């Protein structure tokens, strides 16, 4: 659907405006010298929270918000957030059948999550490469048991993360 495609393109464009700022924020977090780093984003508001963790799986840093500075009131942009919040209403207004709306919204949510995850993974890789650092980081929606390993792109769960780092 055209509305969803345009909205996803807006998301990509808006996220890319934050590339250097987010990479700087990642480097600041890496100064905590954790065994690994967790990044979680709020699915509705896209705010990213980050922590340094020790090998026992305990937090060793204060929560850091990424991006640390916003260009507008909302991240990634006020326009995107407004359109994102009103997408369901817009589908109804365009006469989309109710049973199709759920399918559209599910497809949109999956694509949005994929875009955010791949974008953040690239920010992570760029930050590490530019600083000549090796570190482990994991990214997920807030309060999820499953994370994306930012170095490999593969899914890993909380228990596997803790087990991996408690052995090192």
PLM feature segments, named:
Residues 69-138:
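Amphipathic protein-protein interaction modules
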Residues 14-33:
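Short linear interaction motifs
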Residues 2-6, 15, 96, 100, ...:
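Alpha-helical context
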